[in-house]
Amino acid sequence: MKKILFFAVALMSFVAIGCEKDYSPSPTTRADFQQAYPDAVDVEWEREHGHIVAEFKLPGVSNDCEAWFKKDGTWVLTTYDIKVSELPEAVLNAFQSEYGAATPIDGVEYIEKSNGDKQYVIEFETFEASGEIDVFLSYSPDGKLLNQWVNIYYDYIYDLL
């Protein structure tokens, strides 16, 4: 029984290390965030895989945003969940020419990076003999395919950091 309890506690510790909710960032990081996003509401801070993440809403822009910072507080990127109708025409055309207009899109994110790059990530599902697969495609605003990730367990955000 003690072994089971030990392994349960150890497993929960590993999960807690991966994503620490209710994190309080440094005053400098918090001030930089507030200056960049003065209209942000419902801000929650956490640590995720060594990064500081602010989850927030921007009224009139997106109800699901994340600003990612390095450990030292340097801003890396911000993601905004957006509607398919907000995709640039070039991005939607590139997606539909490759996958068809009838392919349902599960989600779209607009991403701004600290180096000035902007991109859109489209998520959709496809079915193969092995089962259902989540596909993530990253496009530049002019519709160029930048990257793709295929796996239900893979989080593309770590490649962007």
Residue ranges and their predicted role:
Residues 1-4:
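Positively charged n-region of N-terminal signal peptides that target proteins for export
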Residues 7:
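Short, flexible loop motifs at catalytic/binding sites
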Residues 11-12:
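Repetitive helical segments and hydrophobic/amphipathic motifs
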Residues 15-18:
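C-terminal motif of bacterial Sec signal peptides marking the signal peptidase cleavage site
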Residues 26-161:
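First exposed extracellular module after export/assembly in secreted or surface-exposed proteins
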